[in-house]
């Protein structure tokens, strides 16, 4: 009788349209219930039975119920699932398998089966890649996943590397392929094999892509030739190797090993500027005046060189600082090191006065055993030899940026626009409260940005610098020339690492077109999107492997009295994140560890401070002593506690 009743259908429709609904993201808790977060201010409680229909991170539409002044959300429609492709650990045996996603807030095992054609007998503890196939909000009875790839067995010592690479869908090994002979590019190569070129790298480096030669000129001028490995002499544009490099975009440097962009035969041998081996290069000859200015007679050319020495950062630094027992093997090499140090000094001063110089932060290096165990983590400060190479590379990249801009009008540029214009007024207001007066319009110009950065660098602490970081825009890769505010430069285009960066290979091809006087095609914008995405994934992979290794390294320190100096890097409502100064590990200090009385404690991300009873006790950039309270291996998180 009620079937097809238009009045009833209308009533149902009316009820449906009058029922309040909200769209948001599900946030799970460890206690079974959850919240629907609609925005920063508003969230709704999701009771445990309703949480069974959703997963942490799902974007959903929910019906909002009000009972006795308490609102709760009932999930109704899935907008975007949190999990699609994921990695996890397998539970159970062949006929009844489940997978627990490798995520701090996803604890439930999801029933699963192996995909057709996947020839692996999964067992308890195996790591796998899975894809979600069913979801309760899509009309399915329960969650269900399909195992699409076996990663490795549970006790594999190299789990951190293999799982991380699988998670981010990155290659595990070098690309296949060989380059048998050099291309005929119609380039005349200058023979510079008689000059005393040197490379300066880490002792373990095999893919040497830059060699340097310096010469004193009259009028207190210096000449610098930067010679760069020439992979585009072997790899034709559009070839199989070129396409593979284009996809990878960068060599992926992870703790303990790297996955090269090019086949190792090229990266570590044919293109590597090995000592006493003749190699083709793309080179830049520049003249530096007494104050370090790069003069206008910049010259790019093809050449052949023979590096006369593979020098090592620490040994060169020791020798220049008159320590250690290493000596250059000849007076000619010693003279090169002295001249390069002079160039470094001049360029450093020029950049300090006319551009911007980054504050030196140490690099942290993991020393690993044969089974991937962490033997030690050492901080490697940036010393004079590191700065020699850095200044030479920055100078060479400035030269390329100018030549490509003036001769072609395009290239692969690193662009950084400083502050987001939308944030300029808020930035000026914040600085004013700290006694720094800036013009909101001027700070958006390169000169205004540099002026502010120099004022911030002169501050006694880095606190104010850390406060304004959130107002900055991100660096981008662009085919259009543009300024790089972070470096304080009008234009910056890298070409000095073509073995490990595809964008540098593109710039090599463009520079070769300039050398030959040919027209060149502007790179497509899609390539910059691919490069930016790969850079993001590689950085995440490096961080993920690092987190795993830090957790392994500090596990035996949990619950002990071992003290670590730690710099506060971030403050949020829940506590503080700190970086251990000696090894670079990131740890979290929960708010209850800072002060037991929650109502007397204010942790403000906005101000970068922790206040107890109205007094500022901690602020971002403070260095404090901590002990390790706990290391949670399943989430690779380190919990620290301030030393009382």
UniProtKB/Swiss-Prot annotation:
The residue ranges of the RNB domain are 189-516
A GO CC term assigned to this protein in UniProt: cytosol
Which GO molecular function annotation, any one, does this entry have? exoribonuclease II activity
Listed EC numbers: 3.1.13.1
What keywords is this UniProt entry annotated with?
Answer: Cytoplasm, Exonuclease, Hydrolase, Nuclease, RNA-binding
What is catalysed by this protein?
Exonucleolytic cleavage in the 3'- to 5'-direction to yield nucleoside 5'-phosphates
Query: Is Transcription regulation found in the keyword set?
Result: no
* Compartments, as annotated in UniProt: Cytoplasm
Q: Which SUPFAM superfamilies did the record assign? A: Nucleic acid-binding proteins
* Keyword field contains Iron-sulfur: no
Its annotated function is as follows: Involved in mRNA degradation. Hydrolyzes single-stranded polyribonucleotides processively in the 3' to 5' direction.
Family, per the entry?
Belongs to the RNR ribonuclease family. RNase II subfamily.
- What protein name is recorded for this chain? Exoribonuclease 2
Encoded by which gene?
A: rnb
């Amino acid at each position: 009788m009620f079937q097809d009743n238009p009045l009833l259908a209308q009533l149902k429709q009316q009820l449906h349209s009058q029922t309040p609904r909200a769209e948001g993201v599900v946030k799970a808790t460890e206690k079974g219930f959850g919240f629907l977060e609609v925005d920063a201010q508003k969230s709704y409680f999701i009771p445990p039975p309703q949480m069974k229909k959703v997963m942490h991170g799902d974007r959903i539409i929910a019906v909002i119920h009000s009972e006795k002044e308490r609102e709760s959300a009932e999930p109704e429609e899935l907008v975007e699932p949190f999990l699609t492709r994921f990695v996890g650990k397998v539970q159970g045996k062949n006929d009844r398998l489940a997978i627990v996603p490798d995520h701090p807030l996803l604890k439930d095992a999801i029933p699963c089966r192996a995909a057709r054609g996947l020839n692996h007998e999964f067992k308890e503890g195996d790591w796998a890649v899975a894809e979600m196939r069913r979801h309760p909000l899509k009309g399915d009875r329960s969650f269900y996943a399909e195992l699409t790839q076996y990663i490795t067995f549970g006790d594999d010592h190299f789990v951190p590397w293999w799982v991380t690479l699988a998670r981010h869908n990155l290659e595990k090994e070098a690309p296949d392929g060989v380059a048998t002979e050099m291309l005929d590019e119609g380039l005349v190569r200058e023979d510079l094999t008689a000059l005393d070129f040197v490379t300066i790298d880490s002792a373990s480096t095999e893919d040497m892509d830059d060699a340097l030669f310096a010469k004193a000129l009259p009028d207190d001028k210096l000449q610098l030739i930067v010679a760069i490995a020439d992979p585009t002499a072997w790899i034709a544009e559009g070839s199989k190797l070129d396409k593979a490099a284009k996809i990878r975009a960068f060599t992926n440097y992870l703790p303990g090993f790297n996955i090269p962009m090019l086949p190792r035969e090229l990266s570590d041998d044919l293109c590597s500027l090995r000592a006493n081996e003749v190699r083709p290069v793309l080179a830049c000859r520049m003249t530096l005046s007494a104050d370090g200015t790069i003069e206008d007679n910049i010259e790019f050319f093809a050449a052949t060189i023979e590096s006369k020495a593979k020098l090592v950062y620490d040994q060169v630094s020791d020798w220049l600082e008159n320590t250690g027992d290493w000596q250059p093997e000849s007076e000619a090499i010693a003279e090169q090191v002295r001249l390069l140090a002079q160039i470094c000094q001049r360029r450093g001063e020029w950049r300090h006065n006319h551009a911007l110089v980054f504050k030196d932060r140490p690099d942290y290096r993991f020393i690993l055993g044969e089974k991937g165990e962490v033997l030690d983590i050492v901080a490697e400060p940036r010393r004079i030899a590191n700065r020699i190479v850095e200044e030479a590379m920055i100078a060479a990249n400035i030269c390329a940026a100018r030549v490509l801009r003036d001769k072609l009008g395009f290239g692969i540029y690193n662009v950084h626009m400083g502050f987001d214009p939308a944030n300029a007024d808020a930035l000026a207001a914040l600085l004013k409260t700290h006694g720094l007066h800036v013009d909101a319009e001027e700070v958006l110009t390169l000169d205004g940005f540099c002026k502010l950065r120099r004022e911030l660098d002169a501050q006694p602490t880095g606190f104010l610098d850390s406060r304004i970081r959130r107002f900055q825009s991100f660096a981008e890769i662009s085919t259009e020339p543009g300024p790089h505010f972070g470096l304080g430069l009008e234009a910056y285009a890298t070409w000095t690492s073509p073995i490990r960066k595809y964008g540098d290979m593109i710039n090599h091809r463009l520079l070769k077109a300039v050398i030959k006087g040919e027209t060149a095609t502007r790179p497509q914008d899609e390539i910059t999107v691919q490069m930016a995405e790969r850079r993001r994934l590689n950085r995440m992979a490096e961080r993920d492997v690092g987190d795993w290794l830090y957790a392994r390294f500090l596990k035996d320190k949990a619950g002990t009295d071992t003290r670590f100096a730690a710099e506060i890097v971030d403050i949020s409502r829940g506590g503080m994140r700190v970086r251990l100064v000696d090894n670079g590990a990131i740890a979290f200090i929960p708010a209850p560890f800072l002060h037991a009385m929650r109502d007397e404690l204010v942790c403000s991300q906005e101000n970068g401070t922790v206040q107890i009873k109205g007094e500022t006790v901690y602020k971002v950039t403070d260095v404090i002593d901590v002990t390790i309270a706990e290391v949670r291996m399943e989430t690779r998180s380190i919990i620290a506690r301030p030393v009382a």
